[in-house]
Amino acid sequence: MTFTTTRLTLAALLLGASALSATAQDFTPENPECIAPANPGGGWDFTCRQVGKSLQDLGLLDKTMQVVNLAGGGGGVAYAEVVNKRADDNDLLVGAASAPATRLAQGAYPGNTMDQVRWLASIGADYGVVAVAADSEIDDLPELLEMIKTDPTSISVAGGSAVGGWDHLKVLIAANAYGVEDVRRVKYIAFDGGGEAVTQLLAGSVQAFTGDLSEAKGFVDSGDIRVIAVLSPERLEGEFSDFATAREQGVDAIGANWRGFYAPGGMSDAAYDVWVSKVSDLYASDEWKAT
């Protein structure tokens, strides 16, 4: 699993799980579903599919969780769908992350507010990355940022969140740390999910990609892209240990994207408590830690 989890996250999950009542135990999801607010291949899609599979593998769900991709508006299309049409659906989870929380705080989902849904759980932090195509002549993060600093129009950076969303903010954080005076000139192009953004990178439409490790990993394994920086405080362990951090390249930029779920605002207390308990049990399992 490419998420980095914390004790604070686990404590929050267990606190929610402690509220599980006898009534809640009677609820069983009939047709479990997870909405991924982006096209297939991105971090939200990965989160829904991996969590759904793990819940079933652990016996926490006895039915397959259906994953529905609903892209648009940096998560806004999915949010509006849940609020307006699925508000009392007890079987539904929706992939959440820093992006929708940021967009809601910015008032970027017209007519919607954060209290219209029930925030369910965070399952960990997915560190940001900056990547280029495998055959790119750009070797490292400082080289990319120097090109942006010299001529912002020469470099287009693709991401899977809307303008002003988390993928956009990550490249701005790095550019600001490098000394780019007017980060508003950084040329960011938004796509409906990290998978689509990487596709445009491979097509040569853009020169770099900003996203999360979970959505980049498959493209690294296939030899399509190279990660030139991870926005983590220090090098990650295991299979990610070869990826240099921005900080060790002299760019003091850190960006962790929390990932988790929210539920419809009208979900019953019984259903909500059961979902919190299931995700908490998943989080604490050895199987989850090993994936």
Which residues make up each language-model segment?
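Periplasmic-binding protein-like
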Residues: 149-154, 280-291
